[in-house]
Amino acid sequence: MFIFIKHGDNQQFLANINCSVLLLLHYARRKVGLPKTETIDLCDETGTMKLFFLMKTPGDYANKFLTARNTYYVCKVERGAPGTRVESAYKAFVPLLKNPEPELIDALRTQCDLLERSRVKMLRIQEAKKVVPIESSVNLTSKSSGRSDEEGTTRRAPVLKTRADFVSRKDKHR
């Protein structure tokens, strides 16, 4: 099973999708002449990103995510400048085409904005979890009685009998 990958000035090449996503992206990166350090992804003709660069398991086969005989575009994932506060921010998804369609650029921009908003939202949630003070369970109100633990609700532990307890009782009765 093969797909068409377009790039540059209306150039294209075939790629076999009976391989891992990682291998497919390495192949595409080499074919378009990008260094290994560049983050790339594929998008379909409508501009829908496949988000392979976010995959937890890049060893999964590409044929699970791509349709044979379809055309895909190579897109470069631009992130924030290294060493800055916005280092992991998503700046843009840039199609590696000489004259991309305006609809394609709009679709990629929209997806990039959504992904960035989602990333920022997750960061805020993580920061909020770190800031929330944890109350001691001693001061919490008991659900069954409505009284706090400090007001003297004492619970008796169940009496556990061991084998030694039974043996000593038998000895007492003899």
UniProtKB/Swiss-Prot annotation:
Residue spans of biased composition, Basic and acidic residues class: 162-174
Pfam families, sorted: Il2rg
Gene Ontology biological process terms in this record: transcription by RNA polymerase II
Highest taxon above the source species: Eukaryota
Region (Disordered): 138-174
Any one Gene Ontology molecular-function term assigned to this protein's record: RNA polymerase II cis-regulatory region sequence-specific DNA binding
InterPro entries from the UniProt entry: CXorf65-like
PANTHER family for the chain: AB2-183, PB1 DOMAIN-CONTAINING PROTEIN
Protein name: Uncharacterized protein CXorf65 homolog
Organism: Bos taurus (Bovine)
